[in-house]
A protein has these predicted regions:
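Hydrophobic membrane-insertion alpha-helices, especially the h-region
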Residues: 8-26
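Electropositive
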Residues: 82-92
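Extracytoplasmic/secreted proteins, especially bacterial periplasmic and envelope-associated proteins
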Residues: 47-50, 54, 76, 134-138, ...
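Active-site acidic/histidine clusters and adjacent loop/turn architecture
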Residues: 32-70
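Surface-exposed patches in mature extracellular/periplasmic domains of secreted proteins
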Residues: 63-72, 149-157
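Catalytic cores and adjacent binding grooves of peptidoglycan-active enzymes
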Residues: 4, 8-12, 88, 95-184
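Acidic helix-start/capping segments at beta-turn-to-alpha-helix junctions
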Residues: 66-84, 160
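Signal peptide cleavage region of secreted peptide precursors
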Residues: 26-32
Length: 184
């Protein structure tokens, strides 16, 4: 009986020691990249830039003029945008602070429509090509076919002009220096 208890205690100690050793190795030897080590992007990711141009061209073939209103956005620009409706005048337009948006990593664009006379149109029901389909949704369909995720599909904060390609990376991973490949 005493032998059994001693054996259980030793197995328990061995298990605790193993967990402790693994934790020690993880903390001291597995170092994730840090933003200080990986320079932040300064432009739109090449794949996103290419898909943006394809989106504009494919929409034009359907008689829809698309204008890109935002693409890469610096952390400072993001912080200023975040302040709108909070400490700066205007409506709240984002819940993402600097470094928390896919725009800050060159992985997102915002679009609008443009009329033939050059007016930027935010009307999601606008039908300039007269095919009885909302141009906005036609652009969204093209974008999704190209691999973009649409902010209008989000459940929390719908961002109808927003299109992004996250390449399976979270903001947390991007903040720690992970980057998508430069090509598809």
């Amino acid at each position: 009986m005493i032998f059994r208890q001693l054996r259980r205690f030793l197995v328990f100690l061995l298990l605790i020691a193993t967990i402790g050793l693994l934790l020690y190795q993880y903390i001291h030897f597995i170092k994730e990249p840090d933003l200080t080590e990986v320079p932040p992007p300064t432009a739109l990711h090449p794949v996103v830039a290419e898909k943006k141009e394809e989106l504009i061209a494919l929409a034009a073939k359907k008689g829809i003029n698309v204008v890109i209103t935002q693409d890469f956005r610096s952390i400072e620009e993001q912080d200023a945008l975040y302040e709108k409706g909070r400490t700066a005048e205007g409506n709240i337009v984002t819940h993402a602070k600097g470094g928390e948006s896919y725009h800050n990593f060159g992985l997102a664009i915002d679009f609008a429509l443009m009329s033939v006379d050059g007016q930027v149109i935010w009307d999601m029901n606008y039908d300039s090509n007269g095919n009885s389909k909302a141009d906005w949704m036609e652009v969204v369909e093209i974008a999704k076919d190209l691999g973009f995720e649409w902010g209008g599909d989000w459940t929390q904060f719908k961002d109808y002009p927003h299109l992004q390609m996250d390449f399976g990376l979270t903001i947390w991973e991007l903040q720690r220096g992970k980057r998508p490949p430069e090509t598809e």
